Amino acid sequence: MQVTTEAVSGVARRLNVSVPTSRINEQFEARLKRTAKTVKINGFRPGKVPANVVRREYGASIYQEVVNDIIRDSVFEAIQQEKINAVGMPNIEKVEHKEDALVFEATVEVYPEVEVKAFDGLEVERKTAEIKDADVDTMIENLQKQRQTWAVTKGMAKKDMQVTFDFEGSIDGEKFEGGSAEDFKLVLGSGRMIPGFEDGIIGMKAGEEKVIDVTFPEDYQAENLAGKAAQFKITVKQVEKPKLPEIDAEFLKIFGVSEEEGIEKLKADVRKNMEREVRNGLRNQVKQAAFDALVAANEIEVPAAMVAQEIDRQRQQMVQQFTQQFGGAGAQSFDKSMLPDELFKEQAERSVKLGVLVSKVLADAKLEVDQARVDAYIDDMASSYEDPTEVIEYFKNDAQQRAQIEAVVLEDQVVDHILASAKVTDKAVSYEDLLKEQQARRMG
């Protein structure tokens, strides 16, 4: 077999393969003999069919099978012979039967060979944040709000109060589907209703009626209502103000704090959890910034096959999240056509490029996972659980789970390696702003 290779692009190679006709003939004759031993043809006993009859009846199909098998086998032999780091399946083209050889072309995508630019040209913003006493107080207040109750008031409805009311909507004097409800509960300021609706209720008292004018957003999900002006008749039945629980023995007990330890122990525990959250948030932020800079500075071409695989992975991940959120029944009714390739393509391309670049950085720097950092990472994560020892043992005994942590730590080591040479600018942010940024990153 003869093979020549030419570069089609940075990530594709064209193989010109020539297979001697003798190889095809040998395999054809051998398969013809095997077929003659098993084929059943009327008028002949099994295994006694003459070779010329088998050749006449099955020769063409057997020959095509042999050719297909030889093309398949020889293209992979050629890839191995030429030491090509192939990704995805080869594409067979221009098959030609010559007198002395079977000749064909095969195009195959290859893993990118890249050179990473020096890190000293990268600019990375590294954010810093400190937990202040006011942040801890706000967090404890949030814990109280999560367990708040409601107390009826005769006063006016204000933001953060809960209102029970009836409403009846109309457009040009005509009622519309879904525009009415009774005993509807709404926390003012929650943003559950269309713009202007909640503002119209603020200031009302129990027993009052009012008609408010609002306009449905242009992008409202119900197309028959989008952009239209509507009137809602509001009848307030009850106004309730939030009542926070006292920070007493019962409240402290919820968080594993005794009455003797008191509020200071709760504050210390809350601060510890917040500091862990900040560490993780800052680590993720600088990792994102460093990797963004790395990808932006290194324009590389990646194989479509790798991008397609990453698209499939991200799509499957989204389906799994949908299944976890809505259960098996919801997953069965889920239409995957709602998740076209284009939805994931941009992120998938970035992910593949980043993976190639990070792998190259690891190889060039000869980085290996720091097991001490892995243990420290697990210890830090386990400290948020009721029984840290159990969590530590879990990761110690589950190789697959530990491997996932090792991958995260190895990425952190790559980031440290980049930051050691990059132009890093530190920027202090508040705890609140850091949380908002984390939430925005999770949302997309």
UniProtKB/Swiss-Prot annotation:
PANTHER family referenced in this protein's UniProt entry, alphabetically: TRIGGER FACTOR CHAPERONE AND PEPTIDYL-PROLYL CIS/TRANS ISOMERASE (PTHR30560), TRIGGER FACTOR-LIKE PROTEIN TIG, CHLOROPLASTIC (PTHR30560:SF3)
UniProt comment concerning the protein's domains: Consists of 3 domains; the N-terminus binds the ribosome, the middle domain has PPIase activity, while the C-terminus has intrinsic chaperone activity on its own.
| PPIase FKBP-type domain residues | 160-245
What species is given as this protein's source? Acinetobacter baumannii (strain ATCC 17978 / DSM 105126 / CIP 53.77 / LMG 1025 / NCDC KC755 / 5377)
* Location within or outside the cell: Cytoplasm
Q: Which Pfam families does UniProt cross-reference here?
A: FKBP_C (PF00254), Trigger_C (PF05698), Trigger_N (PF05697)
Q: Which UniProt keywords apply?
A: Cell cycle, Cell division, Chaperone, Cytoplasm, Isomerase, Rotamase
Q: What is this protein called?
A: Trigger factor
- Keyword Acyltransferase appears in the UniProt entry: no
Tell me the enzyme class: isomerase
What PROSITE patterns does its record include?
FKBP_PPIASE
Q: Which GO terms describe its molecular function?
A: peptidyl-prolyl cis-trans isomerase activity; protein folding chaperone; ribosome binding
